[in-house]
């Protein structure tokens, strides 16, 4: 075995077309292939996947076959794949029973297979995604059944944590809940947040004011997603390696290669557009050279480009759009500079306010806007949403 005993990743969302309604394909598969190859090269004992490996809307066999191929390749190298479920996977997960090299870490497996999920002196436990009302029971169960002390335990979870995502999504638990039941864990690995985040200082103020002032906070690793699945996500993606050095758990991040991403500086004047037209292909060619240098597959080489421009330049921006053409997947966002005292709110004046007029007043990504427009214009939004889901499933085959 090598210096590292585990490779950690999360939120693969394996499917051929990673984005909802853009023909952007291959990204999640390419990330998974890198994870498998890197784990074998480094000679880890286990690969840990912290949920949302697959996606509920994907009913075809392609993603499952791709996942199984990777698990079998790891198994042939003597590497076990340890996983939990996120909220994006079906609960039955029949694929898991197809490989002797994949181990479901959820609580029943913790109790039954503990000897086979120890690595480098640590026991690795896991809890599938839980609704908020179930989380306390699951944490209590793990706390009661662990065979190792907390500081020699790695716990894998997948939750919408209030401390991290409370303003963006409906929280399904608090990180302080884990601190309360399992203080001083060797490491808490958590999925769902598509941003990489590491907290390595275990001593500090309590996350919950009701906890004692000297409470020992857990070390936390959020691997983030393995490829961009939204233009609002961070472009940098990672897998992480774990090692045990003198009894201490060390974390090292390793960059995942991915589709080139060009985030153009804000375009506020016609002169900015002229500069952009002159400079675009230089930047584009640099991105292609980088992709070629790192042997990025051809289907991953077409870059993502995000342009934000002043709303008064809509007509001029069309010239830039024509220049870019099919050389990149482009994302355009009109941006009206706000007064410093202006609040983040939408004001629609007039007596004839409609859903359509409200939608045009809200800033959102183009794919989200298109789906919203379909639902608004449909006589039966529920049936329209089902049709849209079926379209996404068909596109992934």
Per-range role (PLM):
Residues 1-66, 70, 147, 378-397:
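N-terminal active-site segment of His-dependent metallophosphoesterases
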Residues 3, 43-44, 123, 184, ...:
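Short loop/turn motifs at secondary-structure junctions
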Residues 5, 45-46, 80, 152, ...:
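Residues at the starts of beta-strands that form the adenosine-phosphate
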Residues 20, 57-221, 225-230, 234:
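His/Asp/Glu-rich metal-coordinating catalytic cores
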Residues 41-43, 147-150, 294-300:
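Glycine-rich phosphate-binding loop signature in dinucleotide/nucleotide-binding domains
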Residues 244-397:
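Accessory, non-catalytic peripheral segments of nucleic-acid enzymes
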């Amino acid at each position: 075995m090598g210096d590292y005993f585990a490779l950690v990743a999360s939120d693969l969302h394996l499917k051929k077309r990673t984005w909802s309604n853009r023909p952007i394909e291959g990204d999640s598969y390419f990330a998974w292939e890198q994870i498998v190859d890197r784990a074998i090269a480094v000679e880890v004992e286990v690969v840990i996947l912290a949920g949302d490996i697959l996606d509920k809307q994907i009913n075809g066999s392609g993603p499952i076959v791709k996942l199984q191929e990777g698990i079998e390749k790891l198994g042939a190298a003597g590497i076990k794949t340890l996983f939990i479920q996120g909220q994006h996977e079906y609960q039955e997960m029949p694929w898991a029973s197809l490989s002797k090299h994949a181990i479901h870490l959820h609580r029943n497996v913790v109790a039954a297979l503990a000897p086979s999920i120890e690595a480098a002196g640590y026991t690795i436990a896991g809890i599938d995604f839980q609704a908020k009302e179930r989380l306390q029971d699951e944490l209590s169960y793990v706390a009661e059944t662990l065979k190792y002390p907390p500081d020699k335990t790695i716990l894998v979870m997948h939750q919408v944590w209030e401390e991290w995502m409370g303003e963006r999504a409906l929280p399904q638990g608090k990180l302080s809940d884990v601190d309360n039941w399992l203080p001083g864990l060797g490491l808490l690995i958590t999925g769902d947040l598509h941003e990489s985040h590491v907290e390595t200082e275990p001593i500090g103020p309590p996350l919950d004011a009701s906890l004692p002032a000297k409470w020992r906070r857990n070390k936390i690793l959020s691997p983030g997603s393995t490829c961009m699945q939204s233009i609002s996500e961070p472009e940098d993606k990672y897998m992480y390696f774990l090692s045990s050095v003198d009894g201490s758990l060390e974390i090292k991040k390793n960059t995942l290669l991915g589709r080139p991403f060009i985030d153009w500086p804000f375009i506020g004047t016609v002169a900015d557009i002229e500069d952009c037209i002159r400079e675009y292909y230089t930047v584009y060619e640099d991105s292609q050279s980088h992709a070629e240098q790192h042997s990025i597959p051809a289907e991953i080489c077409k870059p993502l480009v995000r342009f934000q421009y002043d709303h008064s330049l809509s007509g001029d921006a069309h010239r830039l759009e024509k220049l870019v053409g099919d050389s990149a997947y482009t994302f355009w966002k009109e941006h009206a500079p706000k007064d410093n005292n202006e609040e983040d709110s939408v004001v629609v004046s007039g007596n004839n306010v409609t859903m359509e007029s409200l939608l045009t007043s809200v800033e959102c990504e183009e794919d989200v806007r298109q789906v919203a427009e379909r639902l608004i214009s449909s006589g039966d939004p529920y049936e329209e949403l089902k049709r849209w889901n079926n379209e996404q499933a068909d596109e992934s085959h």
